[in-house]
């Protein structure tokens, strides 16, 4: 768990490496201030827990994040409507986040992370505490996101078997050391 957190902290810039560099799009990200890293590299983060304001409705959670990232009202509304359709949220918009199922909450947090059209989407334990049907649904969402070729998805999860159906490359760490790397078939 500590190594997973360190990897995400290094990518997002919350922590600088002790040695070496983090390079994204041929730019040494560690030379940029942290606030510039998220915007320049268009990072999206889906935390293991949280990410929602539970007393707000689904639509209000989406609107809040959109207002932070998208200045023009018309563009905000277009992006929100696109995500509502993409994630099939139409019947859930007026439901408070606290009343959503675990899978619905996870889908909402992923949609919120996609508001700013990230180039890199970081998913922290996306399958934790979810039933098999919801896991399969999230795997499909991840595969669909990656199929566009416009986004890289980085997933940290303890359940490798859940990941192998939705990744083209896997790196397995044990005590901070790489013990396996390659395609899921390897």
Model-derived regions, located:
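ABC ATPase NBD coupling module
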Residues: 29-44
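Conserved ABC ATPase signature
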Residues: 96-100
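Short, small-residue-biased leader/transition segments that mark boundaries at the very start
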Residues: 2-3
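Conserved ABC ATPase "signature" region
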Residues: 75-92, 143
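Helix-to-loop junction immediately C-terminal to a conserved catalytic motif
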Residues: 12
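H-loop/switch region of ABC-family ATPase nucleotide-binding domains
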Residues: 157-158
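Catalytic Walker B motif of ABC-type/P-loop ATPase nucleotide-binding domains
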Residues: 121-125
């Amino acid at each position: 768990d500590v190594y997973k957190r360190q990897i995400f902290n290094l990518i997002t810039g919350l922590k600088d490496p002790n040695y070496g560099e983090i390079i994204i799009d041929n730019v040494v990200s560690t030379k940029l201030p942290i606030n510039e890293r998220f915007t320049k590299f268009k990072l999206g983060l889906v935390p293991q827990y949280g990410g929602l304001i539970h007393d707000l409705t689904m639509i209000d959670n989406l609107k809040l994040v959109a207002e932070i990232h998208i200045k023009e009202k018309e563009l905000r509304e277009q992006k929100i409507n696109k995500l509502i359709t993409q994630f099939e949220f139409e019947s859930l918009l007026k439901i408070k986040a606290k009343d959503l199922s675990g899978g619905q909450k996870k889908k909402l947090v992923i949609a919120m992370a996609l508001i700013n059209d990230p180039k890199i989407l970081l998913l922290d334990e996306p399958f934790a505490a979810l039933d098999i049907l919801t896991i399969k649904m999230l795997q499909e969402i991840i595969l669909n996101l990656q199929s566009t070729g416009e986004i890289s998805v980085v997933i940290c999860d303890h359940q490798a078997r859940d990941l192998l159906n939705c990744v083209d490359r896997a790196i397995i760490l044990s005590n901070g050391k790489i013990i396996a790397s390659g395609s899921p078939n390897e």
